[in-house]
């Protein structure tokens, strides 16, 4: 199927939050946007998830005969799940961005494209690094947009255990995304050590 006849369902961020919807239209795709948990896959040639807050049900993944692609701001297999931008610094794991196929797990699908991103967390806030990661994954997508749309890629399985975090694991004492990364990580870890020492 020619790129210009592709009908794409874009899940998650809207036009004000990402440039990718317009980028897809520039190369001739017809794009519908959806952010709710419920959507109809009928008639689409490709589903793209970016900033989508819901888990796509396994029956949808199995029934949809075309690719479902996710854009995740972590260097998979590290930091699957929620708040990868926080956990990469807290756990001292690699930072980066990954475009991958969606399977039945959470951020466990085969990798299409990936980029490591390095930061100086002494000078940055979590918000700064989030915005940088978002820009990096958009650039990675745009660079490979024709291959992604036409399925001209070779996927590779994720290797290694990596890590996973859910929403509830974000520390309740976390001051927020405008915090200086280095200062906040030190503060949270010191607080955790004090709690452990009190219990022992």
Residue ranges and their predicted role:
Residues 1-200:
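One-carbon transfer enzymes
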């Amino acid at each position: 199927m020619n790129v210009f006849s592709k009908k794409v369902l874009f899940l998650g961020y809207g036009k004000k939050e990402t440039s990718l919807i317009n980028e897809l239209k520039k190369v001739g795709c017809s794009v519908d946007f959806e952010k709710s948990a419920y959507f109809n896959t009928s008639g689409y040639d490709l589903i793209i998830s970016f900033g989508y807050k819901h888990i796509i049900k396994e029956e949808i993944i199995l029934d949809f005969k075309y690719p479902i692609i996710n854009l995740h701001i972590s260097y998979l297999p590290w930091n699957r799940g929620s708040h990868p931008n926080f956990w990469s610094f807290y756990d001292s794991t690699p930072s980066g961005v990954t475009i991958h196929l969606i399977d039945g797990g959470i951020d466990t699908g085969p990798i299409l494209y990936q980029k490591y991103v390095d930061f100086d967390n002494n000078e940055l806030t979590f918000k700064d690094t989030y915005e940088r990661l978002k820009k990096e994954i958009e650039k990675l997508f745009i660079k490979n947009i024709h291959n992604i749309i036409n399925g001209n890629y070779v996927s590779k399985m994720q290797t290694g255990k990596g890590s996973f975090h859910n929403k509830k694991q974000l520390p309740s004492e976390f001051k927020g995304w405008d915090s200086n990364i280095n200062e906040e990580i030190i503060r949270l870890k010191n607080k955790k050590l004090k709690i452990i020492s009190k219990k022992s």
